[in-house]
């Protein structure tokens, strides 16, 4: 069986996961700001060991292309390119916003862009419905108040339904603790 390695270092969180073609089998996510280049390969190996798979079992590496930390994005891309060259597997890059939406349903994906701004992407059935953009918190509140559909909200670390505007805005402003990443 072939697997996909998922890697995101575009924020203060290191995210590493392994999936088969249907679901994520194992994932880790924790704050590793300024240490991602030091710990990413160790965490990849830890997941391989936990799943009892070998690197040669990976046929695809899925990596974030941003938005996010430029240095962080370069870390993940360097790891992905190195592994792809050694293993002969392909690389797929996805928007950081797209990595956290499910393939079915309507999602608004929101990432903290700092300075009271948010990266926002809208997706339906896994496909973007509008181009990703950057909004201030006030613009985001206004935009969300005009929505008539009932999307799920995918923040950087969780898919959340029925979250209030204030809670969501507080979360992306860093006023609430981070919640666990889930696919």
What is each model feature region?
Residues 22-30, 57-64:
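Glycine/charged-rich beta-loop-alpha catalytic/anionic-binding loops adjacent to active sites
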Residues 44, 79-83, 101:
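Buried hydrophobic packing segments
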Residues 39, 43:
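Charged catalytic carboxylate motif
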Residues 44-60, 142-144:
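Phosphate/pyrophosphate-binding loops at sites that engage ATP/ADP/AMP, CoA/4′-phosphopantetheine
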Residues 1-24, 31, 35-38, 53, ...:
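Oxyanion-binding and handling regions
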Residues 50-56, 85-94:
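Phosphate-handling active-site elements
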Residues 60-91:
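DPxDG-like acidic metal-binding loop motif
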């Amino acid at each position: 069986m072939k697997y996909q390695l998922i890697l995101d270092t575009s924020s203060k969180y290191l995210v590493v996961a392994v999936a088969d073609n249907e679901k994520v089998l194992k994932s880790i996510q924790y704050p590793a700001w300024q240490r991602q280049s030091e710990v990413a390969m160790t965490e990849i190996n830890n997941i391989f060991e936990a799943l009892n798979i070998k690197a040669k079992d990976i046929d695809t590496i899925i990596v974030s292309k941003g938005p996010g930390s430029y240095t962080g994005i370069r870390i993940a891309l360097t790891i992905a390119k190195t592994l792809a060259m050694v293993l002969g597997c392909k690389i797929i890059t996805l928007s950081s916003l797209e990595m956290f939406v499910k393939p079915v349903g309507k999602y608004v994906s929101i990432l903290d862009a700092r300075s009271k701004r948010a990266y926002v992407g809208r997706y339906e059935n896994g496909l973007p419905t509008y181009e990703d953009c950057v909004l201030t918190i006030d613009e985001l509140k206004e935009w969300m108040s005009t929505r008539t559909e009932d999307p799920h909200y995918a923040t950087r670390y969780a898919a959340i339904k029925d979250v209030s505007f204030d809670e969501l805005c507080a979360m992306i402003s860093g006023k609430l603790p981070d919640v666990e990443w889930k696919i």
